[in-house]
Amino acid sequence: MSIKSDKWIRRMAESTGMIEPFEPGQIREADGKKIISYGTSSYGYDIRCAPEFKVFTNIHSTVVDPKNFDEKSFVDFHGDSCIIPPNSFALARTLEYFRIPRNVLTICLGKSTYARCGIIVNVTPFEPEWEGYVTLEFSNTTPLPAKIYAGEGCAQVLFFESDEVCETSYKDRGGKYQGQQGVTLPKA
């Protein structure tokens, strides 16, 4: 398995719709102001957060159970930025829609700009033939409220191409998050 370059990412995005919308360069400024960068980098793609958030709250004092998750644990919020309470988290989704080729696996890592502020972005790998908007998890590890920005970079996707095609893809096995459209809560 080898990591793929900016040239490969551009070619795949433009010819197969692997990433939509796609930014072929690296954007660091908008409307004359500095932003957290997004777009194609040397060996990855910096994804953006959409203005759609689910902020975790403890108002119902419930147990967090991934097999029986209570939707009332979240407050829905739409906006250009989102404040995450201390020691809490928020879910969001990418602006970009992904279509992963059958011989490719991705790993997604948080951007250091957020990590240096105690905000950790967690995303699982995008498996072969998975497609959809990516659900993002932002953890605020600080004792203070933390701000995240919609429309700006939040994580980097690295693409790895296998030397052979997998026998069973995410699509083949009917993966439960296939084709997700919005912020998607846990499914057992």
Swiss-Prot record:
Location of the active site: E137
InterPro entries: dCTP_deaminase, dUTPase-like_sf, dUTPase_trimeric
Pathway info: Pyrimidine metabolism; dUMP biosynthesis; dUMP from dCTP (dUTP route): step 1/2
Gene Ontology molecular function: dCTP deaminase activity; nucleotide binding
Known catalytic reactions: dCTP + H2O + H(+) = dUTP + NH4(+)
GO terms (BP aspect): dUMP biosynthetic process; dUTP biosynthetic process; nucleobase-containing small molecule interconversion
Quaternary structure annotation from Swiss-Prot or TrEMBL: Homotrimer.
UniProt name for this protein: dCTP deaminase
Organism this protein belongs to: Polaromonas sp. (strain JS666 / ATCC BAA-500)
